[in-house]
Amino acid sequence: MRAYSTVKKNFHYGAPGLGDRVHSILLSYNYGLLENTQVMLHLTKYQWNRHKPESWPEILSLFPRGSVAIMPHLDYEPISNQDFVDYIKQKGYSNAEGQIYGDYPQRFEPKQGVDLTKYLKHFPQLSAEDCSKDLNLPKKFVTVQWDSTSKRRSMDNNWQAKILSKYKGYEVVTVGGQADNELLRNSLKHIAYAMTKAEYHVGIDSGFLHLSQVYFAPENIHIYTTSPKNRWSHHMHRAKDNGIKINDGIN
């Protein structure tokens, strides 16, 4: 993991959102799969605080056992991204590398590291643990998620209704913070199971955009935004490049 933010100067990167953590493990899984190698994700103490010691293992449990390992380093204070890589190498991991994105580099993107852009073009479409005893899902449905910690990314009720009118014939199963079902609100394995049974995922730029990339083909992920293209996150630009539908059929 990178130790410092690519958008804020000299700011520790803590993987604060669910999407940050899902993205990191999906990226690690894809790298290991495509390079036929074991992957260990090294974390700083800022990536292992608050609720994160419980969150990381929950996300890992969605992936094949042993495909990705994580190791937090709680006693080290990195002074830069490369300093953290050098520290990991000194701990005996001689092949440790930093991560960069060559397609949409951010303002403080590191200069050294492996360009991981191509590994996000793979959509593994994993299976999920059978949760059918816990969930009574419709026969034909889409998973939907609108809530976000960012008001800029959220959709108001009028936009939601306009978008969902495109999906006539499908029932709506809401996942995430607005779900009525507690399991679909708080349990990733149940949300994952619902996604594997859904025809499409419909939503916004959020943690569930990243989670959907574990289970859906890109053309079956439909993301909507009211932001102009020059305000999109690098995740949104990359999603469009990789075949995810953005604002499809909405003017």
Q: What is each PLM-predicted segment?
A:
Residues 74-141:
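A nucleotide-sugar donor-handling region in carbohydrate enzymes
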Residues 2-11, 36-41, 66-69, 91-98, ...:
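Hydrophobic beta-strand segments of well-ordered beta-sheets in folded domains
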Residues 44-96:
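A glycine-rich helix N-cap at a beta->alpha junction
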Residues 138-151:
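Conserved donor-binding/catalytic core segment of Leloir-type glycosyltransferases
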Residues 46, 50-62, 68, 213-251:
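Nucleotide-sugar donor-binding patch of glycosyltransferase catalytic domains
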Residues 18-26, 148, 156-157, 161-242:
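Donor-binding and catalytic core of enzymes assembling or modifying cell-surface/extracellular glycoconjugates
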